[in-house]
């Protein structure tokens, strides 16, 4: 939720390449992996990032619980943000699956965000986050702005 909101704070993350054009989207939807209780098979949940953090989490629980397929293809479009989490290990980088031989692979501009296990060290919490983007649209300055926005949003939880 906070990552999605922080990405929405940086307009460059809303840009997508469509043919010869770059468009700026309005709403972007998180599309994330989830494990059903008692299973090691994950599925991909896609839903709007709406309401408060508590409302979003409750809605995500409902949507995930009712989903009976690996991925609902009806909700798949380029207005997504892909999220994944590896809470079992600290991560410094993650590479996501991409169809590099597809004709429009170079235009894939859906951001992919992954984080791992947080580390507590000297009374500070560290969390490695991997951010994959299309460099034709997003540069280091935008990723830095995302990191700053995410930090502000996390600190506002206190």
Locate predicted features.
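Helical lid/core segments from catalytic subdomains that handle acyl or acyl-like groups
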Residues: 36-94
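Active-site-proximal acidic secondary-structure segment that organizes catalysis
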Residues: 11, 54, 107-158
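Hydrophobic "lid/gating" helix adjacent to the active-site nucleophile
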Residues: 1-30
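Short intrinsically disordered coil segments
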Residues: 46-49, 97-102, 128-130, 146-148
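Flexible, Gly/Pro-enriched loop and linker segments at secondary-structure and domain junctions
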Residues: 71, 78-85, 90-126
